[in-house]
Amino acid sequence: MPNLIADPERLKERLELLPTSAGVYLMRDEAGEILYVGKAKNLRNRVRSYFQPGHDHSPRIAIMVGKVHDFELILTDTEAEALVLEDNLIKTHKPRYNVLLKDDKQYPYLCITWSEEYPRIFVTRRRGSGHPEDRYFGPYTDAGALHSTLGLLKKLFPLRQRNTPVFKDRPCINYEMGRCPGLCQRLISPQEYRATIRQIQMILQGRTAELLAQLEDQMQTAAAAMNFEHAARLRDRITGLNQLGAHQKITVPDSSVSRDAVALAADAALVSIQLFQVRSGKLIGRLGFSAAASGEDPGHILQRVLEEHYRASASEEIPLEVLTQHPLPEADILATWLAEKKGRKVEIHAPQRQIKAELVEMVARNAEAELQRLERFSRRQEKGLLNLAEALELPSVPRRMECYDISHIQGTDTVASRVVFVDGAPAKQYYRHYKIRDPRIVAGRPDDFASMAEVISRRFARAESEPEGDLPDLVVIDGGKGQLSAARAVMEELSYGDVPTIGLAKRLEEVFLPGRSDPVLIAQGDPALHLLQRIRDEAHRFAVSFHREQRGKRMTRSSLDDIPGIGPAKRKILLDTFRSVPVLEKASFEEIAKTPGIGSRLAQVIHTYFHGEPEAVARALEAEQAAN
């Protein structure tokens, strides 16, 4: 059965049955996948508008309409109920066409990995790529200020510093310096550590005043109990938080105000949106968004931006007042929805009063400045692509570029990376890691040529099963003639010899082409060379980080892993009980046997492993293996 737009009779029949009540509509493709979820106070008018001939849809929505095979309706009593239901459905199904804002990686987020036993806090440019329990704050417009703030928080609060421990049996120097609570050796319980993370989350939510009051109470309690060392740490933390607040610009005289202000600037191709967060009279956050220009009314754009932003916000992060540059078409519905989420009344309006109007004007000026920056960046990216196509005599502009790099230490833990740039910008959803499988490549016997050949073979061997658009317009090999020759031999063997391929040597930034002995020289400062350097450096970073991760896993492998009968669960029990392998090694048989879940037989195996003669160890291991 064809899609609705190609089946006029079925489309007419479906549209005639539409009700005029409020509700939610779900657009589905031929496979039944939800493409888009929307709300409407009049479902008949809203859904019909998608299929009216000559309707000026944005390119994104026009593509979506062409894929609609059918739609589903859910009726509600009120428009506010429709907004709440739409929010829940979007969170559940994550339809691809409900994303208005561009995922351009321009602005960073701060992520807290609540899904982990000991949560991490880090800066990322990919929102929502992890576990649903993880929390994201942002996107922030000033990456430098964000990194500085995170650095200060790490000084004030002892936090997890690494993904993998440095040592198996003792904490690293960060613990000795008071920067980490020693969670790698479980010197702090998950409950205690998560309480610290909750305090940091309060800061990110703009609840610093509330946190300071809590810390003051804790300091007084510690001092009364004569725990002066703990009281001093709390005092230093309070001082640091006050210093952090001193750098925040006071924007309004009302010290209790909690409000967001949003404005936009647009040209023919792009919309730049800025949202300022004011809490307790201080500007605590400048968030930036961008979207492709669609010709929509500015009020409609702001409405959709706010809905998308607050959909991902916790109740504590919703302000009591939202100031908008333009009136919103459904401000009352949005205010009702936000009030239900927050549990308090939320006001939304385009201000006329001097102080509030000046705040919105300041946000609008920042949106205009950011739009100009984005335009300059876009022009430079396009110039780099055009210059590169000319310098390399490519058949077309390299919209999709792939770069490959190898990383190892003398053949140990050899890995490779693939990074992808689309229109001159990183497209991290296409990044890949590779573990080199060639058995000939081992410690002391590295072979970058064979490693590169393997990676290119694995990538293009599966190219036939991928959409045609996933083939690169240009392949960049991080290396000289040897690596390039190895890659080209494989590509030609797999019938992909027509894909343009170059090698980029690090030392002199020389560009090598297949079949040419002399390199192509691209002038320093040329946007084309800058583009090649960026993708090469990104591939190197991605490969090195993966190699470091693999090496860390190998180095931190516990000696307990060599004892039969001890899996992850029992290893955790033993380390929870004895804190480290050296302490367990010194324990008596009786102490080990008392450990819950271990038992006397396994305790004998463990004790013999650490203390017995080789023959005794072998007999104990054989007995345990036979018992299992």
UniProtKB/Swiss-Prot annotation:
Compartment(s): Cytoplasm
DNA repair in keyword set: yes
InterPro entries in alphabetical order: DisA/LigA_HHH (IPR041663), GIY-YIG_endonuc (IPR000305), GIY-YIG_endonuc_sf (IPR035901), GIY-YIG_UvrC_Cho (IPR047296), RuvA_2-like (IPR010994), UVR_dom (IPR001943), UVR_dom_sf (IPR036876), UvrABC_protein_C (IPR050066)
Gene Ontology cellular component annotations, sorted alphabetically: cytoplasm; excinuclease repair complex
Gene3D superfamilies: 5' to 3' exonuclease, C-terminal subdomain, GIY-YIG endonuclease, UVR domain, UvrC, RNAse H endonuclease domain
Alphabetical list of Pfam families matching this protein: GIY-YIG, HHH_2, UVR, UvrC_RNaseH, UvrC_RNaseH_dom
Chain ranges of the UVR domain: 209-244
Record-level Gene Ontology MF annotations: DNA binding; excinuclease ABC activity
Signal peptide boundaries: none
Alphabetical keyword list: Cytoplasm, DNA damage, DNA excision, DNA repair, Excision nuclease, SOS response
Source superkingdom: Bacteria
GO terms classed as biological process: DNA damage response; nucleotide-excision repair; SOS response
Ranges where the GIY-YIG domain occurs: 20-99
Protein family per UniProt: Belongs to the UvrC family.
UniProt subunit comment: Interacts with UvrB in an incision complex.
Physiological role: The UvrABC repair system catalyzes the recognition and processing of DNA lesions. UvrC both incises the 5' and 3' sides of the lesion. The N-terminal half is responsible for the 3' incision and the C-terminal half is responsible for the 5' incision.
HAMAP family cross-referenced by the UniProt entry: UvrC
UniProt name for this protein: UvrABC system protein C
Organism encoding this protein: Gloeobacter violaceus (strain ATCC 29082 / PCC 7421)
